[in-house]
Amino acid sequence: MLKNNIKLIGYLIRQKNHAILQTKMITVANGHRIIPLTVHVADTPKKRDKGLMFVENLPENEGMLFVFSAKTYGGFWMKNTLIPLSIAFLDSNGKILKILDMVPCKGNFCPTYDPELYYHYAIEVNLGWYKRNQIKEGDFVMFV
């Protein structure tokens, strides 16, 4: 059992204070190499609203994939999020349009991290993961 009570059961995951979420393996290509990333899929309004709230630890090559049925506009906030994150906003082809760093918010008034563009997907990972892997705007995510 992992420290943060994450138990892998096939392609499903149960986290403390979270419902069962489907996981998916994706890859991120930076022009020099392909980096695998396991993501927890948030594809309903309820799952997207919960996001990574109350998660105390996120393994290094894991994240959360937010899937929207159509292009969307607007930002993310970090209310009740305990760990700092980086987020990439993608178009419908998987092209990374914008990457932002986000810090936890302990108060009631939390800033919104807004890419100020339309996007189809968003991927949250540990703070600095994109930078450590030399992933930048214009790179692509492949949904395997």
Predicted segment positions?
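Helix-rich terminal scaffold detector
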Residues: 2-5
